[in-house]
UniProtKB/Swiss-Prot annotation:
Name of encoding gene: gatC
This protein's name: Aspartyl/glutamyl-tRNA(Asn/Gln) amidotransferase subunit C
EC numbers for this chain: 6.3.5.-
Region (Disordered): 51-95
Gene source species: Myxococcus xanthus (strain DK1622)
Catalysis: reaction(s): L-glutamyl-tRNA(Gln) + L-glutamine + ATP + H2O = L-glutaminyl-tRNA(Gln) + L-glutamate + ADP + phosphate + H(+); L-aspartyl-tRNA(Asn) + L-glutamine + ATP + H2O = L-asparaginyl-tRNA(Asn) + L-glutamate + ADP + phosphate + 2 H(+)
């Protein structure tokens, strides 16, 4: 599936990426190749293949949760570029 330059620009806008014209051309080619690979996978007959949730049969070994004292807010915010009361302040990204 060949993507158009406009489609790549639209995806870049949605991802809030600013691309140079060279990057737009490169991503048009690369994303088209990825979509071609996905189309190939979609055309495979996998009816006889049993579903798997994990590639290996090992189970996760998790440690027990143990509560312990945390850092005081002053110490954890000591190197923060911006803070609001006892929280990190970050730029708003959703309009």
């Amino acid at each position: 599936m060949a993507l158009t330059l406009e489609q790549v620009r639209h995806v870049a806008t949605l991802a809030r990426l600013s691309l140079t014209p060279e990057e737009e051309q490169r991503f048009t080619t690369q994303l088209s190749a990825v979509l071609d690979a996905v189309e190939q996978l979609q055309s495979l007959d996998v009816e006889a293949v049993e579903p798997t949730s994990h590639a290996t049969l090992t189970s996760s070994r998790l440690r027990e949760d143990v509560t312990r004292p945390s850092l005081p807010p002053e110490k954890s915010l000591a190197n923060a570029p911006a803070k609001s009361d006892t929280s990190f302040a970050v730029p708003k990204i959703i309009e």
